Amino acid sequence: MAKETEMEFEGTVVEVLPNAQFKVKLENGVVINAHVSGKIRMHYIRILPGDKVTIVISPYDMTRGRITYRKIGK
């Protein structure tokens, strides 16, 4: 059985939580929990409330996601 593909969404960081976790409001209005990807962590990219980000969500758990990109300029 093939692995399901991940879905990509745009959103805005609403709240910063401990352990590099964030609450992100997607463009469709849904708020999910997200953590940063390894490359963002490795390059010490800061994510603050109000930042526009790209999120990857697995079809198996639609309540959690991974931040893969922070948009430059709000």
Swiss-Prot record:
Fetch the InterPro entries from UniProt: NA-bd_OB-fold (IPR012340), RNA-binding_domain_S1_IF1 (IPR006196), S1_domain (IPR003029), TIF_IF1 (IPR004368)
Question: From which source organism is this entry?
Answer: Mycoplasma capricolum subsp. capricolum (strain California kid / ATCC 27343 / NCTC 10154)
| Functional summary from the UniProt entry | One of the essential components for the initiation of protein synthesis. Stabilizes the binding of IF-2 and IF-3 on the 30S subunit to which N-formylmethionyl-tRNA(fMet) subsequently binds. Helps modulate mRNA selection, yielding the 30S pre-initiation complex (PIC). Upon addition of the 50S ribosomal subunit IF-1, IF-2 and IF-3 are released leaving the mature 70S translation initiation complex.
Q: Which CDD domains match?
A: S1_IF1
The S1-like domain, residue ranges: 1-72
Which superkingdom heads the taxonomic lineage of this protein's source?
Bacteria
Subunit architecture: Component of the 30S ribosomal translation pre-initiation complex which assembles on the 30S ribosome in the order IF-2 and IF-3, IF-1 and N-formylmethionyl-tRNA(fMet); mRNA recruitment can occur at any time during PIC assembly.
Q: Which Pfam families match?
A: eIF-1a (PF01176)
Q: Which gene encodes it?
A: infA
Keyword annotations? Cytoplasm, Initiation factor, Protein biosynthesis, RNA-binding, rRNA-binding
Q: Name one GO molecular function term.
A: translation initiation factor activity
Does Electron transport count among this protein's keywords? Answer: no
Q: Name one GO cellular component term.
A: cytosol
Q: Which family does it belong to?
A: Belongs to the IF-1 family.
Where is it located? Cytoplasm
UniProt protein name: Translation initiation factor IF-1
